[in-house]
Amino acid sequence: MIKNNLNKSQMAGEVVTEPLAYEWYGKIYKTFHLATTRLSGVKDDVLVIVEAFKLGEVKRGDFVQLEGSIRSFHEEIEQQRRLVISFFAERATKILDHESVNEVVLEGYVCKPIVFRETPAGFKISDVMIAVNRGFKCDYIPLVLWNEDAERFKDLEMGAKIAIKGRLQSRAYLKEIAPGEVVRRFAQEVSVRCSVCLNEEEVC
């Protein structure tokens, strides 16, 4: 068996959709969307998957605290195969206060060429896709690195091992699918605030 990479996350926020139940290989799971709030006040939408018995009697409008890991899977959306990022909760606790937590810790391997760019506002960004081993499976998780981290990591080759801390964020964007036809889509990625290249043994 391939050794698992580090993949730990904590979330706390408001349940903004009614949990929906489904069965998978004999187990009952529930899925819902969780809203977590940044310091700026912007809300991030997190897709949560959890075994039903661990969630208990939670409904839309409740606040929950979760511990688990970031997962990915492919889904057919609008006749295209797209990567969906989710939070798989191992523990779930209903809470009374309006706490907001969104903390992600990952290690994995660069699995696509890194895309480095600079925004009109002068921000430097590196888009990085990492593969995080999970037994015989692998989760593909997109990262966004900013400014100094973006510069430092832009020339990493595929296969380089990195570790990061950050938050799972969501954003809307416009995509042209045909001449003159633009659709609004949503992406989820981990915004990195602290990073280290394990190959080089640099300190975060």
Can you say where each PLM-predicted feature lies in the sequence?
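Single-stranded nucleic acid-binding surfaces, predominantly the OB-fold ssDNA-binding core
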Residues: 1-204
